[in-house]
Amino acid sequence: MIMFLSSLVTTFWEALHLKTLVLAVVTFLFLINILRSRHPKNYPPGPWRLPFVGNFFQIDTKQTHLVLQQFVKKYGNVFSLELGQSPVVVVSGLPLIKEMFTHLDQNFVNRFMTPVRERITGKNGLVVSNGQTWKEQRRLALMALRNFGLGKKSLEERIQEETHHLVEAIREEGGQPFNPHLKLINAVSNIICSVTFGERFDYEDCQFQELLQLLDETMHLMGSSAGQLYNGFPCIMKYLPGPHQKIFRNWGKLKLFVSHIVKKHEKDWNPDEPRDFIDAFLIEMQKDPDRTTSFNEENLISTTLDLFLGGTETTSSTLRWALLYMSSYPEIQENVQAEIDRVIGHKRQVSLSDRESMPYTNAVIHEVQRMGNIVPLNSSREVTVDTKFNGFHLPKGTMILTNLTALHRDPKEWATPEVFNPEHFLENGQFKKRESFLPFSMGKRACLGEQLAKSELFIFFSALMQKFTFKPPINEKLSLKFRMGLILSPASYRICAIPRV
């Protein structure tokens, strides 16, 4: 009996100690969370936060930009969030965005390194690198774009040649309903492939088609709930199964694809006659055998992939939006075709020199970019030093999101912000630039492929309007619904391309 009571007391004390220990651990974690969540005086306002998860579950990742629009209405043009353990400040409005990226550009020049990007690229490449690495990679990328086509007749000729392949591929559909996604992404991808890899890929190349599908899936997953969960809670998510693990498997396949092309280049390249970006990078590596710069194997793969991704997804998604809007607004499509018929005719190839004579077509392309809104929150930045901004204190290391959705749908800037209206970019029949139009961002980290993208959009779009009339399938209604990922792309759709000539 005494032994039984002794055992019972011992068990009781052990249970009590265990509960005390658990309570102590939980209390400690809450205190740590409170200390980490404490903000300095004059920190931007924002919605209430849950311990540990912050505002993560208050944001619908399928329409993040629309949720943030509601926060803008409540908290103003500068407000704060916490995504997992990451403090975030969202900035809206043209004056504040200009101040951030021009007058205070040194304080916001760095990219914020998300856990997903850190795992797949480290601090390598062009998109998320900072400091000396970014400067060196950007310099070489700009040189490659300049030397291998940007602003030269050869690039225009490459786009025109690829346009011919695209037109023929669409013509083969015979006016029947089809999804233009893969054809457009293949055409656009071939332009940047000619600059980076020195070759194009046929539309029937099964291996390349599979790669493009991997690319599309990866971009979608990185911006999905699974990708954002990983960014918010990497220490936990890296051990759990789920769609987020596919990001890393897919990225490995993309790296392997580029690695094979690099190895082929290493076998037959001539330093005196560089053919493309990879050759130019190999020359820089040869100059620096001790690897004192960022020109190494890791950056070769990462920067090449960054150029490939950046030069493919954004422009192809814009063209997908363009065909969707033209199919949905036939009267606007007719106006574009009338201008093309008057300036170019039915047979002559579209040229960049035609752009000045085609203000309406140019306005339509810009309106597609405004309404398509493919980069609704810009690429994230990081505060490099403690900064006073618009009366608020922004601590070093804070993630910054610039709200391009609010800018491109601002009723103070646009007559009909929620309606597709090319007149936004026209004045007295002439094309009008708009200061509040920033699809390529601004400042030192603006998109370095802006001129390439503009050239592609004009030639591809004008040529497709010249050769086809795009319509919804019979008895089908097109939807302008979007799919959220790293970029905002249209939901899958089918259209009919009716030959005009």
Swiss-Prot record:
EC number assigned by the record: 1.14.14.1
One matching Pfam family: p450
Protein name, per record: Cytochrome P450 2J5
Alphabetic keyword roster: Endoplasmic reticulum, Heme, Iron, Membrane, Metal-binding, Microsome, Monooxygenase, Oxidoreductase
InterPro entries attached to this UniProt entry: Cyt_P450, Cyt_P450_CS, Cyt_P450_E_grp-I, Cyt_P450_E_grp-I_CYP2J-like, Cyt_P450_sf, Cytochrome_P450_fam2
GO function term, MF aspect, one: heme binding
Catalytically driven reaction(s): an organic molecule + reduced [NADPH--hemoprotein reductase] + O2 = an alcohol + oxidized [NADPH--hemoprotein reductase] + H2O + H(+)
Organism encoding this protein: Mus musculus
